[in-house]
Regions:
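Membrane-permeabilization and membrane-interfacing ectodomains
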Residues: 67-428, 432-444, 448, 455, ...
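Calcium-regulated, polybasic anionic-phospholipid
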Residues: 188-189, 449-485
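Short proline/glycine- and polar residue-rich coil/turn motifs
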Residues: 482-487, 496-498
């Protein structure tokens, strides 16, 4: 027996009028009305308390009265009018399936967004103020359609230090809690939404090369919004697919049928939308390499913001970068990740022209304004509310099965902490909070003075030997070994993080009562690694060893080369 489906069409006249009344509560804010309201003169006169209350109530009600006058522009249209009228822009952008794992629309409709006539052969018609008041129709499943303008020339920007943080921010485009009812709360520190999205692939590819910081700059323009009815008519294809699902307890065979539905329609459907356009640029820069080049995260973010504002025409044509920004942009904007330390991903949503290379065109500001002007005719979804698909199924057993398979699919694709570039770091003298070296050419120096042989500092007595050690302003001195031409010290010295490659100087001395005699001097320039050496003195031989371990992310003989994999 086929399952009963939630949302089968019931187009009684009463329900349609309820739909019409809901649609006609559209608010269309206009500055002129607000300004007129602010200019209403209020005289300071003495009046009875009752009259004063009535006057205040009327003033408070005035905005509502103005709105009612405006929203009645939507009306019922005859069948002839409905056939002639075009749909509102973006009428079919809700009702589509949505996959939260890939954080994208599936292109398959679960809701019928093409039907516009009620059983009494009427539809809802509304004037579109962005199309010179042209009368346009709404699908019968659409409620609360509203034209409004919300555009800004201010770029929003943010920094993210991990794949985890970046993906969680991208999920903010979904403006409701999409996980309600899917039993996903107890999974722990993982990323669920967008775990297999294009953004996740981009971010992880950068983190696999090197520790990356992500700077996001975006600008959004919104022109329309609407939502679907709570029990919309389902699409014929989705209805047919649901009827083919088994009601029995999930088996390997039935699981495949449910997973096929998810492959086609996703995990959710889009219930509410805001339409317009968005330009978003994600810049991944190699955190530690940027630090070594002398650019802080805040400086890079500021320079990128100025560069994009200039490209979009938000700044005067004669505006210029600061010297540091100019050096950053000209020297490091290569798309090759190893050639510079930044790479970009540009996303353009909405509009009739796609311009991923906006920053490299002859006149990108013209391209941007042309794209912006096309949004009123060709909007796309800039934010949405989504609900799980099982909410649309009236058969309780099939709904429960679908809910379980959706939860299973989302959990299977989660990203664990070790896949997200998360790393704890304790700052050290040459490491910052991101575990990045602050300066190249530095490493930890360890020195061992072992012994000396055949010292002949005095003619008639044996040597009272000690060693002076000098390194880049650091001084150490061994203990004195009395009456021994072959002294043994086995003394160890830790110099900490030092600048590698400076002069390491040893002076061997014979301590006497009146004045000390120098047995000889030895000079070397330390390099990375462990080295055991002997040094011929003027009177004898000195034996010692040293080791240098480059600071994190540094390599090379003198630790002067940046290496993402070096620990």
């Amino acid at each position: 027996m086929p399952p009963r489906l939630r949302g089968q069409r019931q187009n009684s006249e009463g329900e349609f009028l309820d739909h019409f009344c809901t649609t006609s509560t559209i608010k269309s804010k206009r500055e002129s009305d607000t300004e007129s309201l602010h200019r209403v003169p209020i005289r300071s006169t003495t009046m009875p308390e009752s009259q004063r209350s009535i006057s205040v109530s009327l003033l408070l009600a005035l905005p509502v009265i103005l709105e009612v006058g405006r929203v009645r522009a939507c009306r019922l249209g005859s069948a002839t009018e409905c056939e002639k009228a075009p749909f509102v822009p973006g009428y079919n952008l809700a009702g589509e399936g949505f996959d939260v794992v890939r954080m994208r629309r599936t292109g398959a409709y679960v809701i019928n967004v093409k039907g516009h006539l009620a059983d009494n052969n009427t539809c809802t018609l509304c004037p579109n103020r962005f199309h010179k008041g042209q009368i346009q129709k709404l699908p019968s499943s659409v409620l609360d359609w509203r034209p409004f303008s919300r555009c800004s020339k201010e770029l929003s920007s943010a920094l993210h230090h991990s794949v985890d943080s970046l993906l969680r921010s991208s999920s903010s485009l979904v403006n409701n809690n999409w996980g309600v009812g899917l039993s996903l709360d107890q999974i722990g520190k993982v990323v669920l939404g967008g775990s297999r999205s294009d953004l996740a692939k981009f971010a992880r590819s950068q983190h696999n090369v090197d520790r990356a910081t992500f700077a996001i700059h975006e600008i959004t323009c919104t022109y329309y919004s609407y939502r679907l009815a709570d029990h919309p008519q389902l699409s014929a294809a989705f209805t047919k697919h649901l009827k083919g699902l088994p009601r029995n307890t999930i088996t390997s065979q039935s699981r495949a049928l449910y997973r096929r539905l998810i492959d086609t329609y996703g995990t959710h459907y889009i219930h509410q939308v805001q339409l317009g356009g968005k330009v978003r640029r994600i810049t991944a820069f190699r955190t530690c390499l940027a630090t070594l080049k002398g650019f802080s995260e805040a400086e890079i973010k500021k320079c990128l913001n100025a560069e994009l504002r200039m490209a979009l025409g938000f700044l005067p044509a004669n505006a210029s970068y600061s010297n540091k920004c100019d050096m950053l942009m000209k020297g490091n904007m290569s798309m090759g990740f190893y050639q510079g330390f930044m790479t970009h991903k540009i996303e353009v949503t909405g509009g009739e022209k796609y311009f991923p290379d906006i920053l490299y065109q002859q006149d990108p500001s013209d391209a941007y304004h042309s794209w912006m002007n096309s949004l009123q005719d060709n909007p796309d979804v800039v934010s949405y509310a989504i609900f799980p698909l099982h909410h649309l199924v009236e058969d309780s057993q099939i709904s429960a099965n679908l809910r379980a398979i959706i939860s299973e699919y989302i959990q299977e694709n989660k990203l664990q902490g070790d896949q997200l570039g998360l790393k704890n770091c304790s700052p050290t003298p040459n490491l910052d909070h991101n575990c990045c070296p602050l300066r190249a050419g530095r490493g930890a120096l360890k020195l061992e003075i072992h012994r000396a042989a055949s010292l002949k500092a005095d003619t008639f007595t044996k040597t009272d030997a000690y060693v002076k050690i000098f390194y880049n302003g650091i001084y150490e001195e061994t203990a004195t070994v009395l009456d021994d031409d072959n002294p043994v010290w086995n003394a160890t010295y830790y110099f900490g993080s030092v600048e590698v490659g400076q002069e390491l100087r040893f002076e061997v001395w014979d301590r006497d009562v009146l004045y000390n005699d120098q047995a000889g001097v030895c000079i070397i320039f330390p390099e990375r690694g462990t080295h055991s050496l002997s040094c011929q003195l003027r009177k004898g031989v000195l034996y010692f060893s040293y080791s240098i371990k480059c600071d994190a992310h540094l390599s090379g003989f003198r630790c002067g080369r940046y290496s993402p994999t070096a620990e």
